[in-house]
Design a protein with these regions (language model features):
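Short aromatic-glycine-(Arg/Gly/Cys) micro-motifs in beta-strand/loop hairpins
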Residues: 14-40, 63
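Compositionally biased amphipathic helical and low-complexity segments enriched in hydrophobic
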Residues: 5, 24-25, 48, 59
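Negatively charged, low-complexity tracts enriched in Asp/Glu with abundant Ser/Thr
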Residues: 1-7, 36, 47
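A short, charged, amphipathic alpha-helix used as a generic interaction element across diverse proteins
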Residues: 35-38, 45-63
């Protein structure tokens, strides 16, 4: 899992397989100040495509001042 955050927001990314054995990039994101969150599932056909999707997401999040946390 890759975790990113700003002072008030968080964004988590992971690669999983669903019940049908399809590959998904799952993004959970929301505000640290409320209990509400969102989930986005992106269907991909291979690990290479999943890594491309994650790289694109990371570039966008970095432009919005998110930082990677460990």
């Amino acid at each position: 899992m890759i975790s990113l955050e700003t002072d008030t927001k968080y964004y988590n990314i992971e690669i999983i397989r669903d019940l049908f054995d399809d590959l998904l990039v799952v993004c959970d994101y929301g505000s640290k100040n409320t209990k509400f969150s969102h989930r986005k599932n992106i269907h991909v056909s291979s690990m290479a495509e999943a890594n491309l999707v994650i790289d694109k997401i990371l570039k966008i999040r970095e432009k919005h001042h998110y930082r990677i946390i460990k």
